Regions:
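Cytosolic catalytic domains that perform sulfur/thiol-centered chemistry
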Residues: 1-74, 78-79, 85-205
Length: 205
């Protein structure tokens, strides 16, 4: 998985609330298990009018936001059904960070596991960033120091230290398991000491 330390780029504002996973990547594009190519169909119903004819009113079809690496989204982003294709499509398009007031839990977990940084900020901070994004200002997202810098503005953000470590080092689930292999082996070898009730049941039998 790609390491995330500092991201510099343009941010696109998509302010609608409750953008669900079907809006992010509609169900007809879920037949593949390949991550590459899904970015073309990201926000399909909003980006295109018919077939793949671009809707020029949609922000990701406008310059410079067509090259965005950051989205500033409305609250409860990623609600709806669980589909890992949603973060796949975002990443394949080039989005590496999403900033919002809140995210759906399942989407949040799927995103973290795929290396997509999700940042929660309060509404006032979101409004400040929205205004700067619409002015086409360049954003810097520093995960190591947990801060967003835009022009003369700096906003700090909180993140779970485990998630932070995972993203900075680019660990996927398999790499995390291998990293903790000895702890897992030790636990398996000693688990009966922790599960006393098993010993009691075995003695009664």
């Amino acid at each position: 998985m790609k390491k995330f330390t500092i991201l510099k780029g343009i941010a696109a504002v998509i302010p609608d609330i409750n953008i669900d996973t079907d809006a992010i990547i509609p169900k007809q594009f879920l037949k593949t298990i390949h991550r590459k190519g899904l970015g073309k169909s990201l926000f399909y119903n909003e980006r295109y009018t018919e077939g793949y004819n671009k809707n020029l009113d949609f922000i990701l079809n406008k310059d410079p936001w067509s090259n965005s690496s950051i989205i500033i989204a409305g609250e409860n982003f990623g609600c709806g059904s669980s589909r890992e294709h949603a973060p796949w499509a975002l990443l394949d398009f080039g989005i590496q960070c999403i900033i919002s007031n809140s995210f759906a839990d399942i989407f949040f977990n799927n995103s973290v596991k795929n290396g997509l940084l999700l940042i929660k900020l309060n509404k006032n901070e979101i409004e400040i960033l929205n205004e700067l994004a619409m002015k086409k200002e360049s954003f810097s997202v520093d995960l190591i120091n947990q801060k967003i810098s835009v022009k003369n503005n700096e906003i700090n953000f909180n993140i779970d230290p485990i998630i932070k470590d995972r993203l900075i080092h680019g660990y996927d689930d398999i790499e995390i398991t291998l990293k903790n292999k000895q702890l897992i082996v030790d636990y398996e070898n000693n688990k009966n000491k922790f599960h006393i009730w098993k010993n009691i049941v075995n003695e009664k039998q």
